Amino acid sequence: MMVFAFWKVFLILNCLAGQVSMVQVTIPDTFVNVTVGSNVTLLCLYTTTEKSLEKLSIQWSFFHNKEMEEPISIYYSEGGQASAIGQFKDRIIGATNPGNASITILHMQPADSGIYICDVNNPPHFVGKNQGLLDVTVLVKPSKPFCTIQGRPEAGHPISLSCLSAFGTPSPLYYWYNIEGNTIVPVKESFNTATGVLVIGNLTNFEQGYYQCTAINSLGNSSCEIDLTSSHPEVGIIIGALVGALIGAAVIICVVYFARNKVKSKQQKNLNSSTELEPMTKVHHPQQSEAISADGVQLEGTLPSSIHAGHNTEPTTTAVLEPEYEPNPPLETTTQPDPEPEGSVPVLAPEAEIQPHPELDPETETEPEPEPEPKPEPEPEPELEPDPQSGVIIEPLSKAGEDTVKA
């Protein structure tokens, strides 16, 4: 180590210079075991040929493990002034009497296990054995081990049981037992006490039931239990949970699917109904005009037959009113005597009846709306020639809704 090499070189130089002053360090207990959480005193005694102790220095260093390259300083005292450093701050109390370089460490923890170095110097005394080493181990009771199963716990399958404690110093040994009622019996199969692994070649050849693993060291023991059966309940629980989750997901998907289809079907039905009702509101006026025009043609066609029917009787004249194209014109029945020649008979104009609107053909509800036809222009009425037998001439009236009869 570099520290030791330095002191050896320094010792050789002092010897060559003729110096004979020496410091001697003694370690009573090289190996120290301490229980976790307790206090420990690390003894380090020294002697010096120099009477004066004013320049005496004491230093403690620590190796957490042997792989550390350099030790770390945890305590230093010189001239009556002392201080603790690092993870040991406020946890170290140093001795004050001459010849004693011991320290007491409070509340030891597992991380405090390692190598401690006591180094004493009293200039000009640099010759002699001024260092001492102590190996300190913090003892920890085994923590509760973890029992696990490797392999499938089914008949005919090889499996193994393992047992491991996270903490425990010294390292615990592991033992397997079979629980039969209130009795704990060591297993017949062989197992590794250092690793805690119990190998079972064939589950059918192994007695089923509860098994216990116990971790033991010098401070105590801890145990864990495991249930080993061919039909392990944990496997059934996991399978049941998976099946239940899949069924639940399938039900939710089906409900959402049918609900969306129902909403879409209802929306489509409402859309079709509104499309069918649109042409029904636009078919009244064109058919009404056509109906009025047809009635006018029918009245016009009946005029000659009425006149010819009375040719062997007294001469009579029937006036026919042509329907107006204006909607619902008020019609009056009047008789206006015009200057007529003798022998003519006035004829009363019949009262025009307002034709009711024709009922809609049910077929038009489903047919698209017809395009409105252009309104036909009224044809000029032909002039009526006098009937040679009756001598009556029909002329249209000058006012709406009236006719004049001339003989």
Swiss-Prot record:
Keywords: Disulfide bond, Glycoprotein, Immunoglobulin domain, Membrane, Phosphoprotein, Repeat, Signal, Transmembrane, Transmembrane helix. It comes from Mus musculus (Mouse). Residues 256-407 are cytoplasmic. The keyword Repeat applies. This is V-set and immunoglobulin domain-containing protein 1. Disulfide bonds join C44-C118, C163-C213. The keyword Lipoprotein does not apply. The lineage of its organism: Eukaryota, Metazoa, Chordata, Craniata, Vertebrata. Glycans are attached at N39, N202, N221. The modification Phosphoserine is found at S273, S274. The chain crosses the membrane at residues 235-255. It is a single-pass type I membrane protein. Residues 23-234 are extracellular. Residues 268-289, 318-407 are annotated as: Disordered. It comes from the Eukaryota. Its main location: membrane. Residues 1-22 form the signal peptide.
